[in-house]
């Protein structure tokens, strides 16, 4: 029997017997993070943060560095996998009421914001056409901030336009933020295991717990193996499936792409931003699309923790998932009818879900006669 604190923490950690496959995504995210840090380090060794050499250095990595193509594709596609796992992880938290463990939820959403910032800075680094214009459009939103906007943008750019200082500081931020992510992840795990994870029934599992190892480690390994297998299949056979064709051209400030869009995992937020025809309004909606997740623990009024036995909340939850997918799809299309109205309707529905949580909880309590 291990007596060391760390071994005890991970090996003998008591976990509910009835947690399902949806609880596997935490360990998958940890694997994704390790993969990103590892591949990112080897890419940083060969990368040059200069606007004249950045694009060429990526070409050099993929062509000349041994297994450079694999590192580059694992890093890029691994980021997409990372965010897919994150969104499923958050959806599970919403469905099963994991957000009632407030400290864990708050640290998790802070982690999400840090991850989004890191991924955005990373997307700019290849200095391709779409990287440059996505950076221009998104950083330009800072000018919408009253009084301070222009100063903030100039400070972030390191000049009056996106140039060499911008790329240098984005590379520095992309390199340093993963250390903040590792720290926040550790905090997230510590806070989670202080109270213990939730379970599909939303009941107190203290009377029925088993050690994390070997039971849940073996269960986690199945999805983990499938995820790595899928990642390697995509890297080997369709490495450009998530890439934008415009990004295979070097950044040209004089030529605007026909349709500017960020990476796959940011499309829902970009769709919400684009649906509002006002710069400040769009920027606020973009920020609120993530920040609204902080409010959920305080708007929960239902007496039952998970949505397992709450049909109205289930209906709204699956409507949210459909809305999320539809916004993502609409954001890939040009800004023209009918995609404008689709984005506006789905963006409204997205925020409606979060506003309806307290009302639905109250109605369900009345329906089930829970006082």
From Swiss-Prot:
SUPFAM superfamilies on file: a domain/subunit of cytochrome bc1 complex (Ubiquinol-cytochrome c reductase) (SSF81648), Transmembrane di-heme cytochromes (SSF81342)
Coiled coil: none
Record's subcellular location: Mitochondrion inner membrane
Cofactor, how bound (note): Binds 2 heme b groups non-covalently.
Entry annotated with the keyword Transmembrane helix: yes
Keywords from the UniProt entry: Electron transport, Heme, Iron, Membrane, Metal-binding, Mitochondrion, Mitochondrion inner membrane, Respiratory chain, Transmembrane, Transmembrane helix, Transport, Ubiquinone
Annotated InterPro entries: Cyt_b/b6_C, Cyt_b/b6_C_sf, Cyt_b/b6_N, Cytb/b6-like_sf, Cytochrome_b, Cytochrome_b_C_euk/bac, Cytochrome_b_N_euk/bac, Di-haem_cyt_TM
GO biological process: mitochondrial electron transport, ubiquinol to cytochrome c
GO cellular component: mitochondrial inner membrane; respiratory chain complex III
Spans through the membrane: 25-45, 69-90, 105-125, 170-190, 218-238, 280-300, 312-332, 339-358
Binding, heme b b562: 75, 174
GO molecular function: metal ion binding; ubiquinol-cytochrome-c reductase activity
Pfam families in the record: Cytochrom_B_C, Cytochrome_B
Residues given in the record as a ubiquinone binding sites: 193
Domain of life (superkingdom): Eukaryota
Keyword Transmembrane helix: yes
Cofactor(s) it depends on: heme b
Residues holding heme b b566: 89, 188
Membrane topology reported for the UniProt record: Multi-pass membrane protein
Subunit text: The cytochrome bc1 complex contains 3 respiratory subunits (MT-CYB, CYC1 and UQCRFS1), 2 core proteins (UQCRC1 and UQCRC2) and probably 6 low-molecular weight proteins.
Protein role: Component of the ubiquinol-cytochrome c reductase complex (complex III or cytochrome b-c1 complex) that is part of the mitochondrial respiratory chain. The b-c1 complex mediates electron transfer from ubiquinol to cytochrome c. Contributes to the generation of a proton gradient across the mitochondrial membrane that is then used for ATP synthesis.
Family from the record: Belongs to the cytochrome b family.
Additional notes on this entry: Heme 1 (or BL or b562) is low-potential and absorbs at about 562 nm, and heme 2 (or BH or b566) is high-potential and absorbs at about 566 nm.
Name listed for the protein in its UniProt record: Cytochrome b
Organism: Antaresia childreni (Children's python)
